[in-house]
Amino acid sequence: YGRSATLLNELITILKGTDKAEESLYMLGMSYYNQKDYSTAAQTFITYTNTYPRGTFAELASYHAGKALFLDTPEARLDQSGTYTAIQQLQTFLEYYPASSKKQEAQDMVFALQDKLVLKEFMSAKLYYNLGNYMGNNYESCVITAQNALKDYPYTDYREDLSILILRAKYEMAVNSIEEKKIDRYRETIDEYYAFKNEFPESKYLSCLLYTSPSP
């Protein structure tokens, strides 16, 4: 494939302005894709769609641009700029080609990328929880981070994990509160507990959940 990419780059220059230039550019993108050089492949496919928006391979180029960006996304713990770019490209593909045979695959990739973004938020919330009261009220930051993730991605596969983290953080906030805030925070924790139990009645976490009722 490396040799093919070299030859195709030369051909594109020679064939510029001819009917064969379009096909050669798409083939170049596939050559990079098959080499697993996903960043260059995506750039090449995007160049194709910009140059030949109604071209023979426009739909496939748009799809493969999104898939290449999808395959090039970083681990959840790293910066997720590439993940947002991949989502944007896949959503562009879905917008332009709503009847495509690749529609379901593209949607599945979008959902997987969104879950990666949620996982990063979950990892951040969990870190805040583990920091506890070190240099401030990290439990509150945990709650805010987890709640924002649920607001942005309400159907995420991490919904239960984020919800239990919120409940546990609220419990710790109640335990560590000053006396005048303790009763209200315990009540919030109890409300959170029942909300969790109602939404996840079969949760694996329920057997180990305990809360302390506020003193009268």
Language-model segment annotations:
Residues 211-216:
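Conserved small/polar residues in nucleotide/adenosyl-binding loops
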Residues 13-21, 49-58, 77, 91-108, ...:
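Short solvent-exposed coil/turn linkers within tandem alpha-helical repeat scaffolds
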